[in-house]
Amino acid sequence: MASLIYRQLLANSYAVDLSDEIQSVGSEKNQRVTVDPGPFAQTGYAPVNRGPGEVNDSTVVQPVLDGPYQPAPFDLPVGNRMLLAPTGPGVVVEGTDNSGRWLSVILIEPGVTSETRTYTMFGSSKQVLVSNVSDTKWKLFEMMKTAVDGDYAEWGTLLSDIKIYGMMKYGERLFIYEGETPNARTKGYIVTNYTSVEVRPYSDFYIISRSQESACTEYINNGLPPIQNTRNVVPLAISSRSIKPRKVQPNEDIVVSKTSLWKELQYNRDIIIRFRFDNSIIKAGGLGYKWAEISFKAANYQYNYISDGEEVTAHTTCSVNGVNDFSFNGGSLPTDFAISRYEVIKENSYVYVHYWDDSQAFRNMVYVRSLAANLNDVMCSGGDYSFALLVGQWPVMKGGAVTLHTAGVTLSTQFTDFVSLNSLRFRFRLSVEEPSFTITRTRVSKLYGLPAANPNGGREYYEVAGRFSLISLVPSNDDYQTPIMNSVTVRQDLERRLNELREEFNNLSQEIAVSQLIDLAILPLDMFSMFSGIEGTVNAAKSMATNVIRKFKSSKLASSVSMLTDSLSDAASSISRSTSIRSIGSTASAWTNISKQTQDAVNEVATISSQLSQISGKLRLKEITTQTEGMSFDDISAAVLKANIDRSIQVDKNALPDVITEASEKFIRNRAYRVIDGDEAFEASTDGRFFAYKVETLEEMPFDIEKFADLVTRSPVISAIIDFKTLKNLNDNYGITREQAFNLLRSNPKVLRGFMDQNNPIIKNRIEQLIMQCRL
């Protein structure tokens, strides 16, 4: 029988488990070899750094303190002061012009009586008599000589609570601080070659501009800012000041990392986003004074702009979320102005803009991480919309404004009829602005937000400038395309082919000859014979079968087989043990004038019908697992499928698994099944109808639901190809013998073919009705 194809698919489902497991193991092994999971494994929504976006401000903010820097020889720039922060006693800093000045600054701790200490100054050890009579303050004093072989003499002194010392080259002088904190003041020494003075600090130091002299004096007397006194501030090498700043290009492709097969490429792009709102204005029926709806709807916009000397073609889609519904009712009369609903976006709303362009960044936007974007804010203000009334002055909705602030960016996909495009989805939060919106000649005024009546305000578009950055995983060979993990485009192509195939199948089903169908239905169709009509599948029959079984495994039919026994048992046990009743047709003939009895009978019929529908839905599974000699609905379904596959010109190996799975679920939805016990037959359909009758006379009898429930669990279930109504109609018009009746009840294919050869219109019409139900 043709339904062998379905049983073969069910019986071989275990092979799919093994195949999937082997394929999964192989895939995991390949991933370990070629791609390092971790940052490369992020393929859905990328990590997002949300921020306020770019803030337009013309003020130049310059830091007061530059540093701290690590001790190192340093050519102090003219006009900049060096602040030194020593942590212990000893030489703090040395400076010389190599001709007439050699200066060393020494730090002495509090409470030191007169004593001689040895210091290394300019590479030579010198003994210096030092003292500090203060018990609370540190002493910084300058030792200076005017010749290479000269002796050092003490010049200026600074008593400090906080151990901060400063010096600066400016105006042919070397300026230092002297006195006692908190009243220390600057003092200058004339230096002949002051521009060539090189200093050698022995402690961390800062650099501060001469223009900040008041702040510098404050630091000398009262200490550095609190943030500089934390352990989180780490001194840098002074060489970092000489790093030349690199001018950022509008568009950059930077290789972050690279292996033999893959590389991570960072795309930095300056973009211009142009978008516009769209709306729908629906006027209500009547005399023309009422409006049903004014709402936002998604708007597409395509444009070109120049980015880094190249022309870019961009596409945006703008939509809104979290709209606020307003209404206005001017009265109950037909000539009173009213708006049933108009939408307004406010602080609780969001605007979404999907952006895509034809640059290289969007062609490799598959495996992405570190996605971030900064965008300017944009103000959207509404325009005027006049409500054209038949008579009288027109109300005008005017005003309203909101500002869009960027609130995040994620990856998304824009779908068209033929392709799906990777895009960026920018989310904007809103803040209301002036002016408010009003409806003139009404009491609606001073409301804030942007109404949907004229959200663009006469503009063609709104524009936002910004920059985004992402790191994408791409093949190292630029000639290769990025593989797509979840190929939405491929799936869409398959769906489009499936839709075309469904339409073709439905048309072909109407052209199948009934005699041809019977011949196909009684053939034992297996996997190879089912696919033999498709060109090019002979060599790929093995992989074709695996693909079909894999798809069929997820069908409702396959998932229900494993639960067949439990389902039938549960359904049978739920049958209420009530008295036997006649079928639906017989109940009507048993009508009496007593309304209560009539209502009880109708209720009982409805209850039985509901209970039987639970069982009849499982009878197909019971029939598949207990094959009989008769023809089944699945034989007809498989025969129609085979006939259409042979005649179709659009079936391919990619679409076939979906077609077979869909056919198993959707072909012949309205089915009837019967069980036979001696001379009695019980018949139940999937739509809840049921009959019980004698086989020899075809007379109805009371439907014993308990007996039926018992029979379906232990007796063969037969497809009612020729249902009771058709059988009774055939007997009434042509007359059939008891043997013919039994053969038709058992759906004997030879007897059915005999009636078809005789061109019996009743049997032929029944088969044609079943064929018409074979639709996708």
From Swiss-Prot:
Region (Spike head): 65-224
Motif (DGE motif): 308-310
Region called Spike foot, residue ranges: 510-776
Keyword Transit peptide: no
Record Gene3D superfamilies: 1.20.5.170, 2.60.120.200
Region (Spike body and stalk (antigen domain)): 248-479
Name this polypeptide is given: Outer capsid protein VP4
